[in-house]
Amino acid sequence: MAIDLLSTFIKPMHREGTKFVAIFAVVTLVLFLIWEPLGWIGVGLTVWCYYFFRDPVRVTPTREGLIVSPADGVVSLIEPAVPPAELGMGPAPMTRVSVFMNVFDCHVNRAPIGGTVTAVAYRPGKFLNASLDKASEDNERNALAIRLADGRQIAVVQIAGLVARRILCEVREGTPLLTGERFGMIRFGSRLDVYLPEGVQPLVCLGQVMTSGETVLADLASPEARRTGAAR
């Protein structure tokens, strides 16, 4: 029972966090030598750093055609928008679903659906609050185009935020991805935009809490109209 309880709190850590946790741990040892109360503050910060870089296992639905959330967080925007020009996906608007991650969310990013990466495009930019509408256009971003088995395309865009200053993308053009597979992360608060294929409606609502790799964001085969919801 004790082991089960520990597993609830202790999660695997993304390798990107190893150096940061090591630095925090060394600084903590120095703080203990200077003054013990400072050392305990360092312990708390080290634990927080480990928690930030956690990379928990997720149970991804495997039915063909399901699009899952690429990030933990809250749905902040659902609107028509043209995908980033650097992806070469054309000028036609697509339904964009934005998931905002705060500093307490897990920041590992996952593929919303299986397919082949056809383009990866990084663009430098500003570091505005990622929850703002204009962050999609003005902020630093890294965009991916994924071609599905039926030939349709979906776009996923990692957007840096006010605190987030480091976008990590571990895939390149030609990389095959499975639904829910890890492809990168953004450090310290940010946003993920998903551009859905034409005619596909989101099955999530504004303000809904999302779990990356698990929450179904849309269904390619569903005729259901866009959902609405209310906070209760």
UniProtKB/Swiss-Prot annotation:
The modification Pyruvic acid (Ser) is found at residue 190. The active site is at residue 190. Pfam families: PS_Dcarbxylase. GO terms for cellular component: plasma membrane. Its cofactor is pyruvate. It is found in: Cell membrane. The keyword Cell membrane applies. Its EC number is 4.1.1.65. Pathway: Phospholipid metabolism; phosphatidylethanolamine biosynthesis; phosphatidylethanolamine from CDP-diacylglycerol: step 2/2. It comes from the Bacteria. It catalyses: a 1,2-diacyl-sn-glycero-3-phospho-L-serine + H(+) = a 1,2-diacyl-sn-glycero-3-phosphoethanolamine + CO2. The record marks 189-190 as: Cleavage (non-hydrolytic). Is synthesized initially as an inactive proenzyme. Formation of the active enzyme involves a self-maturation process in which the active site pyruvoyl group is generated from an internal serine residue via an autocatalytic post-translational modification. Two non-identical subunits are generated from the proenzyme in this reaction, and the pyruvate is formed at the N-terminus of the alpha chain, which is derived from the carboxyl end of the proenzyme. This is Phosphatidylserine decarboxylase proenzyme. The lineage of its organism: Bacteria, Pseudomonadati, Pseudomonadota, Alphaproteobacteria, Rhodobacterales. The gene is psd.
